[in-house]
Amino acid sequence: MVAKPDAFRYDTNGDDMKDNILIEKTIDFGARIVKLNRYLLETRQEAVLSKQILQSGTSIGANVNEAQYGNSKADFIAKLHIALKETAETEYWLRVLEKSDYLDENMASSMLSDCLEIKRILISSINTAKDGQK
């Protein structure tokens, strides 16, 4: 049975990355995106938009995680910028899915809220890292 979209929550159970709130939030969000993709494919028979949001929504966390292993501060900032761009794309797809009635307002609002929170944290992290470069 496919999880209902309002249940797109993933609980992490303590690992080495737990100290980094951004990584934790992007893992949780990525898991919600995977569940959303499954819902869209299995319940709504939607394959095109679901693939788009799966790619952008899971790429956010992948780039944040990769940034932790950057060769330099500039590399770290560049990876966070990529994650920020993926966040903007994911926000776009969530709005399209809502406007096209694949997601109801409550589902879209919950996921958009998480997406925008990650976006704010990324912007703050990028600004802090840039200030540290000066």
Describe the function of each predicted region.
Residues 1-62, 66, 70-134:
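Short, C-terminally biased terminal segments at protein or domain edges
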